[in-house]
Amino acid sequence: MNNKNIRNIAIIAHVDHGKTTLVDALLRQSHVFRENEQVQERVMDSNDQEKERGITILSKNTSVMHGDIKINIVDTPGHADFGGEVERVLKTVDGVLLLVDAFEGAMPQTREVLKKSLALGLKPIVVINKIDRPGAQPEKVVDQVIELFIELNATDEQLDFPVVYASAKNGIAKMDLADETTDLSCLFETIINTIEPPKCEIEGPAQMLVSNIDYDDYVGRIGIGRLERGTMKVGMPVSICGKEDKITQGRIAKLYTHVGLKKVEVEEVGAGDIIEFAGLSDINIGDTVCDFEHPEKIPFVDIDEPTVTMTFSVNNGPFAGKEGQFVTSRHIRDRLYKELERNVSLRVKDGETPDSFEVSGRGELHLSVLIETMRREGFELLVSRPKVIFKEIDGVKCEPIELLVVNVPDDCVGNVIEKLGRRKGEMVNMEPAEAGHTKIEFRIPARGIIGYRTEFLTDTKGEGTMNHIFDAYEPYKGDIQARVRGTIVAFEPGKSVTYGLYNAQDKGDLFIGPGVDVYEGMIVGLNSRGEDLAINVCKEKHLTNTRASGSDDALRLVPPLQMSLEKAIEFIAEDELVEVTPKNIRLRKKTLDTKTREREARR
């Protein structure tokens, strides 16, 4: 295909502003699906966790045809934790669709991704989505976006961006709010007229930067990226410029381009198209694939450094090996280092002990998605509380500061400000949002956000939303008070019974019900007081000849609190761990023996 007929764009936005829904609508209206075909919502979110969480985790490619123009579309994650996915795919495109919710306006991740796009000189198209939402203020949001562009030092050319008003859910777009439209035609036309064809050298030796990796059971590792120069053919010998200027040789076995959601095998591809290739078994993200006789490396984009670290270690509890398939340090080590091949924001190094590993990422969600993936693959492991990564700058200890935006009901504002103030949060802006809600911005140490989300949802009766993104490293802000309540810890192994739990529930909130296998040192609840409490939840009522005046079977248990993986990771203190297995998520003390723990506490 002539590269004049190609447009490469990425869709960028804050989480939940409708990127994947817009891609769905573009695919439908370019007749990728048959008229009678049943298509699930958010078809691009193909990963199990993406479907369950309702978010995009991995960036993905697709393409649509509009007339004789091929539009390659890259759908990107909106969560700040997966920012590394966005940063590297921006190198493969020539323009971006900046999607902004007509109700919420520009949010933290919108700012961060736009900043990187403008720095790369990409041409923006602004799409104001959800114009049909009650309370939407599209004109006000356009003004916010213009202010944001000016703040981020956009060039005059970038400031001259087209604005399209859309409802991705209903599949309509218009250039003016007063227009009556029934489809996305004007968005297709705007993309074709605004985004330039790829600036590539048609002639010359082939050259391509690998920006993503996929895997296929039949052909092995697949490299994904944009062909920057020349032509690539099946069977041609190539040179691979890897890390530290290492050059290896290989041969292209298969070539693919995207047509809708399908990969189509081709014999030859010209510069400018986003392609996939197989045949190079040790290819990695950031490598450059070149003509065999002309190895020239393309510099890879700088990925932001991790801000949070956790310790992953071998499960050494009493139930170790009973529920998982991969339980040894070798299994965990191999899996973590394999993850580095495609998860460019991740850092892994060996821990202080032979069976532990320090894993660093962009946030709790980034690491919890990895843990959940490993759990589903059959791994058993222990994980520690997340810790922020400190840096020394000019001899001063510095910590990561986040920009936090919360939207809360008006009657909860005082409580939220007070709680975030205790966590060293500094309020920088406050304005009314929709009816009965207030939007507040804080600058807060990353330490202050860890463990706060569950408390925030309780304080706002489940109505509040919070979003945060890394802002800068600043001098250490001082100590932050940890969890104020202690835990209820089992001190006898066995099976929990109603009688034992009934006595325990007076002391606080329980995490387990009857009939659950427990071991000494396992956390079974949250104490209502500040200290930890060891209790026997396996204790049965002794039988006697004395008849009870009341009914013996009227022991009513309060339903236990359900602990998801994210809640468990947020909940634990420094002396606690989360035991993750394919079947269960348990909380436990680092030191299981009760007497040893009491001795350590007295020191």
Q: Could you describe each region identified by the protein language model?
A:
Residues M1-E104, Q144, I213-D216:
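P-loop NTPase switch module centered on the Walker A-proximal segment
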Residues K123, R133-N193:
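Canonical P-loop GTPase G-domain recognition
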